[in-house]
């Protein structure tokens, strides 16, 4: 490609800015000191250049996190955009292959930056991957944990994307996705938080259910 062709190549801007954050595994430091801003992107080419340049979730050490959040929202429960929110959570047990973990992350990431949640994009804050030795977690954070209607629509799209991506694997990428509010997660006294909403990979499609 000539220099002229490079400068005139389409940029394909995204609708909004997204910032990629990385939390390292240096447990002797505070959480804030472990969190690093990697890059803010707002075009398709920037997104793929960044994605191709860094390790996938399966390549991270245990206790590391990836966070991709929109419009300068910080990946913290305490900030105003997240304080009343919740998350659609996918728990990935150790039985899942590294390729399946990476497939879940990429599928949801592409859906977010590609604005595939329609009008409900305004209710989505970002995407988180927590890499842990006992099993990792991937979650989509939303602004209002009490807006069940919007959160369910987001969950349905999330399920549809993951079910479609599951066709490239020997079994579904997930068993269940659960919606939890952040406040309950912070105050939990056990490893399990009661879900406000849930969707199973074995459930009939929502369109079929609503017709009954």
From Swiss-Prot:
InterPro entries named in the record: TIF_eIF4e-like, TIF_eIF_4E, TIF_eIF_4E_CS
Cellular compartments annotated: Cytoplasm
Keywords, ordered alphabetically: Cytoplasm, Developmental protein, Differentiation, Disulfide bond, Initiation factor, Protein biosynthesis, RNA-binding, Spermatogenesis, Translation regulation
Predominant localisation class: cytoplasm
Nucleus found in the keyword field: no
GO biological process, one term: embryo development ending in birth or egg hatching
Tissue expression from the record: Enriched in the germline from L3 larvae to adults; regions of the gonad undergoing spermatogenesis. Expressed in germ granules (P granules); when associated with pgl-1.
Recorded phenotype for the gene knockout or disruption: Defects can cause a delay in spermatogenesis, temperature-sensitive sterility and defective sperm.
Cysteine disulfide links: 125-129
Single GO cellular component term: eukaryotic translation initiation factor 4F complex
GO molecular function: RNA 7-methylguanosine cap binding; RNA trimethylguanosine cap binding; translation initiation factor activity
Function: Recognizes and binds the 7-methylguanosine-containing mRNA cap during an early step in the initiation of protein synthesis and facilitates ribosome binding by inducing the unwinding of the mRNAs secondary structures. All 5 eIF4E proteins bind monomethyl cap structures. Only ife-1, ife-2 and ife-5 bind trimethyl cap structures which result from trans-splicing. Translation of trimethyl cap structure mRNAs may be regulated by intracellular redox state; disulfide bonds change the width and depth of the cap-binding cavity determining selectivity to mRNA caps.
Family indicated by similarity: Belongs to the eukaryotic initiation factor 4E family.
Assembly, per entry: EIF4F is a multi-subunit complex, the composition of which varies with external and internal environmental conditions. It is composed of at least EIF4A, EIF4E and EIF4G. EIF4E is also known to interact with other partners, including pgl-1. Interacts with ifet-1.
Protein known as: Eukaryotic translation initiation factor 4E-1
């Amino acid at each position: 490609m000539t220099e002229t062709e490079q400068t005139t190549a389409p940029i394909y801007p995204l609708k909004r800015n997204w910032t990629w954050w990385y939390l390292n595994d240096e447990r002797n430091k505070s959480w804030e000191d472990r969190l690093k801003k990697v890059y803010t992107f707002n075009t398709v080419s920037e997104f793929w250049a960044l994605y191709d340049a860094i390790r996938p979730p399966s390549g991270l050490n245990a206790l590391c996190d990836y966070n991709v959040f929109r419009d300068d929202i910080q990946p913290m429960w305490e900030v105003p955009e997240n304080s009343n929110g919740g998350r659609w959570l996918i728990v990935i047990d150790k039985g899942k292959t590294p390729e399946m973990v990476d497939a879940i992350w990429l599928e949801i990431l592409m859906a977010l930056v590609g604005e595939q949640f329609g009008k409900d994009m305004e209710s989505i804050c970002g995407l988180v991957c927590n890499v842990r030795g006992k099993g990792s977690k991937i979650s989509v954070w939303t602004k209002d944990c009490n807006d069940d209607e919007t959160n369910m629509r987001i969950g349905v799209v999330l399920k549809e994307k993951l079910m479609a991506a599951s066709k490239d694997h020997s079994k579904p990428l997930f068993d269940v996705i659960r919606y939890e509010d952040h406040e309950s997660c912070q105050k939990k006294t056990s490893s399990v938080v009661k879900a406000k909403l849930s969707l199973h990979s074995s459930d009939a499609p929502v369109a079929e259910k609503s017709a009954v």
